[in-house]
């Protein structure tokens, strides 16, 4: 039985990375440094732009985050692909929250737009995931649109984020 809370702490997210939150067969979040959120502040089965589910999560920004030291030297900026990965992470986390089992894998995205950046001077990144569809057959898959905001300003959008849960990834 999944503990379906509306919010999750950093410790909860770390437990997910160890396979402790959604059980041995549930999807896992990555461990640090690839875990791209510090907390989930809202999860619902309704709501969002399509009224089919909504997730909102946050990442606290500080100049000591690992990527600022290497991307780029003298011009530090959070890689856009990490924001995209965070959105995929949240789609998979939501599938586990719904009770889905399997190993989460990103399956694609329809379109991504970057209209801003995350600099070391920022305070907080907010991720918003709006679910469009959940497929619950042999393959469990989530389809969603996502937004990334920095200090309240929209900087990335992604349409048709796709994540699947697989029982066996050996042929993937």
UniProtKB/Swiss-Prot annotation:
Q: Which reaction does it catalyse?
A: a (3R)-hydroxyacyl-[ACP] = a (2E)-enoyl-[ACP] + H2O; (3R)-hydroxydecanoyl-[ACP] = (2E)-decenoyl-[ACP] + H2O; (2E)-decenoyl-[ACP] = (3Z)-decenoyl-[ACP]
- SUPFAM superfamilies reported for this sequence: Thioesterase/thiol ester dehydrase-isomerase
Q: Name one GO cellular component term.
A: cytoplasm
Keywords of the record, alphabetical order, are: Cytoplasm, Fatty acid biosynthesis, Fatty acid metabolism, Isomerase, Lipid biosynthesis, Lipid metabolism, Lyase
Q: Tell me where it mainly resides.
A: cytoplasm
InterPro entries linked to this entry: FabA, FabA_FabZ, HotDog_dom_sf
Asked if the Swiss-Prot or TrEMBL record annotates the protein with the keyword Ribonucleoprotein, the reply is: no
* Pathway per the UniProt entry: Lipid metabolism; fatty acid biosynthesis
UniProt-annotated catalytic positions: 71
GO biological process terms held by the UniProt record? unsaturated fatty acid biosynthetic process
Location(s), subcellular = Cytoplasm
Q: Which cysteines are joined by disulfide bonds?
A: none
Q: Does the keyword Phosphoprotein apply?
A: no
What Enzyme Commission number(s) appear in the record?
4.2.1.59, 5.3.3.14
Gene3D superfamilies this protein is in?
Answer: Hotdog Thioesterase
Could you give a GO molecular-function term held by this entry?
trans-2-decenoyl-acyl-carrier-protein isomerase activity
**NCBIfam families xref list:** fabA, PRK05174.1
**Any idea what job this protein has?**
Necessary for the introduction of cis unsaturation into fatty acids. Catalyzes the dehydration of (3R)-3-hydroxydecanoyl-ACP to E-(2)-decenoyl-ACP and then its isomerization to Z-(3)-decenoyl-ACP. Can catalyze the dehydratase reaction for beta-hydroxyacyl-ACPs with saturated chain lengths up to 16:0, being most active on intermediate chain length.
What interactions and quaternary structure are annotated?
Answer: Homodimer.
HAMAP family hit by this protein: FabA (MF_00405)
Describe the family membership recorded for this protein in Swiss-Prot or TrEMBL.
Belongs to the thioester dehydratase family. FabA subfamily.
Q: What is this protein called?
A: 3-hydroxydecanoyl-[acyl-carrier-protein] dehydratase
What is the organism of origin for this protein?
Citrobacter koseri (strain ATCC BAA-895 / CDC 4225-83 / SGSC4696)
């Amino acid at each position: 039985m999944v503990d379906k809370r509306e919010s999750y702490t950093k410790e909860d997210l770390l437990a997910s990375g160890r396979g402790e939150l959604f059980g041995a067969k549930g999807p896992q979040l990555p461990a640090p440094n690839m875990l791209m959120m510090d907390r989930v502040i809202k999860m619902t089965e309704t709501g969002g732009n399509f009224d089919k589910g909504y997730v909102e999560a946050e990442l606290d920004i500080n100049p000591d985050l690992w990527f600022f030291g290497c991307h780029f030297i003298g011009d530090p900026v959070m890689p856009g692909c990490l924001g995209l990965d965070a959105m995929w992470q949240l789609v998979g986390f939501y599938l586990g929250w719904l009770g889905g089992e399997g190993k989460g894998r990103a399956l694609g995205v329809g379109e991504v737009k970057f209209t801003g950046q995350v600099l070391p001077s920022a305070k907080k990144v907010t991720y918003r995931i709006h679910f469009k569809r959940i497929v619950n057959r042999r393959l469990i898959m989530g389809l969603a649109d996502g937004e990334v905001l920095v200090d309240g300003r929209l900087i990335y959008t992604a349409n048709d984020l796709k994540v699947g849960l697989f029982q066996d990834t050996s042929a993937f």
